[in-house]
Amino acid sequence: MAPPVRPGMLPLLLLLLLPPLGSVPGVWSFSELFFMKEPQDATVTRKDPVVLDCQAHGEGPIKVTWLKNGAKLSENKRIQVLSNGSLYISEVEGRRGEQSDEGFYQCLAVNKYGAILSQKAHLTLSTISAFEVHPVSTEVHEGGVARFSCKISSTPPAVITWEFNRTALPTTMDRVTALPSGVLQIYDVGPEDAGNYRCVAATIAHKRKSMEASLTIVAANETRSFYMPTIIASPQNVTASLHQTVVLECMATGYPRPIISWSRLDHKSIDVFNTRVLGNGNLIISDVKLQHAGVYVCRATTPGTRNFTVAMATLTVLAPPSFVEWPESLTRPRAGTARFVCQAEGIPSPKMSWLKNGRRIHSNGRIKMYNSKLVINQIIPEDDAIYQCMAENSQGSVLSRARLTVVMSEDRPSAPYNVHAETMSSSAILLAWERPLYNSDKVIAYSVHYMKAEGLNNEEYQVVLGNDTTHYIIDDLEPDSNYTFYIVAYMPLGASQMSDHVTQNTLEDVPLRPPEISLTSRSPTDILVSWLPIPAKYRRGQVVLYRLSFRLSTENAIQVVELPGTVHEYLLEGLKPDSVYLVRITAATRVGLGESSVWTSHRTPKATSVKAPKSPELHLEPLNCTTISVRWLQDTEDPAAIRGYKLFYKEEGQQEHGPIFLDTGDLLYTLSGLDPRRKYHVRLLAYNNMEEGYQADQTVSTPGCVSVRDRMVPPPPPPHHLYAKANTSSSIFLHWRRPAFTTAQVINYTIRCNPVGLQNASLVLYLQTSETHMLVQGLEPNTKYEFAVRLHVDQLSSPWSPVVYHSTLPEAPTGPPVGVKVTLIEDDTALVSWKPPDGPETVVTRYTILYASRKAWIAGEWQVLHREGAITMALLENLVAGNVYIVKISASNEVGEGPFSNSVELAVLPKDASESNQRPKRLDSSNAKVYSGYYHLDQKSMTGIAVGVGIALTCILICVLILIYRSKARKSSASKTAQSGTQPLSQASASVAAGSDMGKNLERATETAESLVPMMPSSFIDAKGGTDLIINSYGPIIKNNTKKKWLFFQDTKKIKVEQTQRRFTQAVCFYQPGTTVLISDEDSPGSPGQTASFPRPFGATALDTEHSANSEGSHETGDSGRFSHESNDEIHLSSVISSTPPTSNPLAGGDSDGDAAPKKHGDPAQPLPAEQTSAPQTSAGLRYAAEGFPV
């Protein structure tokens, strides 16, 4: 049971259990800024006062201002801001001209951290309109159903009641139902219900009455016949806001009176808690929620039959926005990137927008908005602010906030200065700057930022440069465009401020494409050529001239007409009737003429075609990348009759499609299934029964399917599965895959490559390719590189892919091994040694040694040895005396093999050569004519070696003899111990007078055990410190401070006497209260039958040396429990007592845990339990060797 909580501790516990305020999404700490109260929608009458709440909390001072419809609201005598931030309007004014207090209000709270904007509050005046629907007079048979309705619009919604003959109609009767929607239902009508009815609509400030409608009762027949149920008032589709009340009307007639029931079309159950039936079948839903939305079915059924009829209505529930993901506050360094994510839901779907310190953010340059995300690139100190995500729809608005904190580095460099730009061409601008005045020596890189100066939603581009340059040419710019530039300097701890912005304009260029022309004929001898201006992105400057060229299709002579750039049509006159003319146009800027359009053909009408229809006025408009809208108008003054139209179209350079026959009433046609970014030629003509009319020709181009400039498109995902493999010491092969969810056509890829840990940004390598693989060359050998890839699609760039690391192969050794020496160490064996090739970057994995005698060398026969790269020596064996050997070495790795060293010669002299001629000639790798590496061994050296070897062999022989002697002594001791150990020990009860017999036994045991002294240090560790007193299972241990000696250096007889006396002294003192004492079987007072039941101290426990329950000493002292004796004397004793092998104990195999068989507590032969012993039995952990000796 949990302990009770004291009343005084409850607030403290609640405080501890509550999460920190700043950890809840959308809630901030009190030191910053948030709203405790926000303004709410209000409806008031004219001249009434109103208060809109606004209470902000945070670190002061806090200033509150108000906005009305997005503009700052000025205070006056009638409109004041209270001390708590609320807005007070003493008299609300209605519309007077353009002045009105109605509108949307928001409060803006500002402190040192930034500013936040409240949600919108709609202030409306109470109004009411005239009746839109009045009750209508009706006649009803007695016993039938009467229904009246009225409708009126008001703010707030009016309460509608009914009057009968100018008096309030009671609705307490079961057969009378008044619906809130303005419907009156009367069932089972009688003569008393006849009269005049009207509805009354009332609001908080207004009241209106409708026109009267009369109810006439017609006498019913005496006998009423059966008729099918009929729904006379079916439910209507309803759209309601959250928490409103909805009424679905369903009124039916029939005989017998039908029964009305409700269900949902999706077979879901109807909410019984908020739903009830009003009157005789109307469904009313109070406190509407989202789950109430759906299709409701009203069913009218004749009782006792299967005759029924149904009616359905849809209930749509609108909901204000609500957040499902809130933006989180961020801390970012200068020049970093911040991403805020905000998602909201509602019905209809809310529109998302972002605010910075209460002001709306527009996507441009560094700041981009992608759906519900806000991305801020190249963060600057001015970006430190409070950001709000606002979601709004027709039901309201909601805001969430987050703060961006920009971290500033104290020793960051100052901004680059004296930035100036110079136009180089129509697509290139030279940008130059001066290094920062402060901390310029710490600059590691510069970044150049540029974007278009005009328009919105312009993309900002960035180029990273090294710290060794202060100028850069930016190319691939659009001609005749203004660009804005700025520079940022980078250091390891952060970035500088932005430099001053400079703006520069690129030069003009020739037009990128010609105008699209339209050709029509007004008579048989003319052609009207018209064209549209070239779009700005293709114009590339100001068009100053149009050159119009035309010719007959059967002639080569071209006629040219030049027109000013302000003209967009021209009439070619004096042409031949019924002839095909080819027309083209070229536009020119001040730089020169651009590309000419293709020849467009047009046939002039026949000269006799007096009754031919005139050409229609044709207009072409691309609807999307695959569809063109064709519109035309026919001249209303054309006297010729028109039967229809013929439409032809073709792609430039392809065959013509058509004709497509259209009716005379058709003035619109859509061409679909076209290809994007293609030019199409369309011609249209009217025809009648006699002949075809004049045709109209026009060209148009379909746009691309992805328009990046006109709408924001999120960037594509990065490439994935990037794989790197070293190809050579200077190249690495890269392979990757395009994103799985990208359907756009990839333009190219950019590969970023740089060594790991690069400090100089100018050394970053950027490569372009259109393939999904690339061989990166020109790399440094044996260097680790990092690689990343990004793709580019329609002027969009993906993020960089995850980085992949890979090292180039080491370079093949460029030099041979150095310091090659050859030494003859035996008559037929030589030692070759060398050093690795020079150069710190050289990696060697293998050495190749070639050697041969001069005869074999002449024949080209080499003997080959291989050694690993870590070995720098080798033995040359089986050399033949009397020959001169040539040796050379090379180094290699997985890339290749390096050159061989200079040959080194070694002369192997014959055995009968004189001592005076034993020194051979030397030749090293630097001089192939001199013998090298042969070290002469004279007589003195050989004598020293022989003496050393003799001493070593003597020592080895002595050690072998000692080991043989000790081995024999152990075998003898084992046999004696086995004989004496067959008789069990019993508890000691002898007195001091019996010490002589015990002394004999101990002396005999000592003689047996003295050869078992282990030559090992004491393993007892007193981990806790303390005195020198050591206690084990045999009592206190008397420390022997005498110097230890090896057995074969001591006097054996003297040892026996001293040890016998010492054993006797200890044996006399064995008995202690509560202690188990072990004595030999000859002095045991127990009978032979009893001794068999004694547990042997070490016999049973030896079966479990690691986990014995009796090894408590190890827990107390930190010892392992195997040895706890300090001196050789105690080791002797334990050896004597435990010399019996464990298998001699009949109880040893009966307990796997090493414990003795249980005995009665009163048995004198039973050892006391472990918890009653005065000393821990640390000796229980002794292990035995195969011969039975303790280890």
UniProtKB/Swiss-Prot annotation:
> Fibronectin type-III domain: from which residue to which, for each copy?
415-509, 511-607, 612-711, 718-811, 816-911
* Disulfide-bonded cysteines: 54-107, 150-199, 250-298, 342-389
Q: How does it sit in the membrane?
A: Single-pass membrane protein
Q: Region entry Disordered: which residue ranges?
A: 975-1010, 1079-1191
* Residue intervals passing through the bilayer: 944-964
InterPro entries cross-referenced by the UniProt entry: FN3_dom, FN3_sf, Ig-like_dom, Ig-like_dom_sf, Ig-like_fold, Ig_I-set, Ig_sub, Ig_sub2
UniProt keywords (A-Z) are: Developmental protein, Disulfide bond, Glycoprotein, Immunoglobulin domain, Membrane, Repeat, Signal, Transmembrane, Transmembrane helix
Q: Which Gene3D superfamilies match?
A: Immunoglobulins (2.60.40.10)
Q: GO:BP terms for this protein?
A: negative regulation of neurogenesis
- According to the entry, every stretch annotated as the Ig-like domain falls at 24-124, 126-216, 229-316, 321-405
Instruction: Enumerate the PROSITE patterns for this protein.
Output: FN3, IG_LIKE
Sorted alphabetically, the Gene Ontology cellular component annotations on this record are: plasma membrane
Tissue pattern of expression reads: From mid-gastrulation to early somite stages, restricted to posterior neural plate and mesoderm with an anterior limit at the level of the rhombencephalon. Posterior restriction is progressively lost during somitogenesis. Expression is maintained in the neural tube and paraxial mesoderm during this process. As development proceeds, further restricted to the dorsal parts of the spinal cord and somites. In parallel, expression progresses caudally during axis elongation.
- Indicate, by first and last residue, each region the UniProt record lists as having compositional bias (Basic and acidic residues): 1104-1132
Q: Which residues lie on this side of the membrane: Extracellular?
A: 24-943
Instruction: Kindly indicate whether the keyword Glycoprotein belongs to this entry.
Output: yes
* Source organism per UniProt: Mus musculus (Mouse)
| Residue ranges that the Swiss-Prot or TrEMBL entry lists as coiled coil | none
State which gene encodes it. Answer: Prtg
Identify one Pfam family in the record: Ig_3
Please identify the protein, giving its name as recorded: Protogenin
| One example GO MF annotation | identical protein binding
